[in-house]
Regions:
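Predominantly extracellular beta-rich ligand-binding scaffolds that present long acidic/polar faces
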Residues: 1-193
Length: 193
């Protein structure tokens, strides 16, 4: 789905998404995009459980479990594997994150290549917007790269074992519930099974 001027709510992808080939165009950020769900001006309560695999030559690719570029992403999650071979950013929730909160990733995220970067939440955090109250379970970094002049926006991306209501207060909102099965917070709508 791609709809830059609209809102996407409660959408999901459960299938595998893959691309192998030569990317055309420029050789820098935002050249090519691949995601489990898609892109919109605003995305909420969306999720991906499918495997996302990208193998490229030339070009630069943003790859994300939910979205390739996040303008406003809230209450979304990814459980699928996200992998990039080539140049670009790979993120569990979003390839390039600009603004969003209360998202999580439990899928494995990898990026291989000279100019490839991976993050459990985002491959790249750009600008000075609010990115907070996100969590992940993997052993990687919260983001592959950050471009900003201040740090607090991203400081609340936590490993699940370190989450408290004090350091991620929004995760106790009406959208979340504790899962005994998973031993962590999950979304009430579009629940992780």
């Amino acid at each position: 789905i791609e709809a830059s001027a609209v809102k996407i709510k409660q959408c999901y992808n459960k299938g595998a998404v893959s691309f192998t080939g030569v990317c055309s165009g420029r050789d820098y950020e935002g050249d090519n995009e691949v995601a489990g769900v898609g892109f919109a001006a605003s995305m909420s309560e969306c999720y991906n459980t499918g495997k996302i695999t990208v193998n490229t030559k030339n070009g630069f690719t943003n790859v994300g479990g939910v979205s390739y570029c996040g303008t406003k992403i809230k209450n979304c999650y990814n459980t699928g594997t996200v992998s990039l071979t080539g140049k670009g950013y790979a993120g569990g929730v979003v390839g390039e994150f600009r603004d969003g909160s209360c998202n999580y990733n439990v899928g494995k995220v990898t990026a291989k290549g000279k100019y490839a970067m991976a993050g459990e939440i985002a491959g790249y955090v750009s600008g000075e917007n609010t990115v907070s109250d996100n969590y992940y379970t993997g052993s990687g970094k919260k983001s592959g790269r950050e471009y900003t002049s201040w740090v607090p926006y991203q400081s609340k991306a936590k490993k699940v074992s370190s989450i408290t209501s004090a350091n991620c207060p929004k995760l106790s909102s009406k959208y979340w519930t504790y899962s005994g099965k998973h031993k962590r917070l999950i979304l009430k709508n579009n629940k992780e099974v």
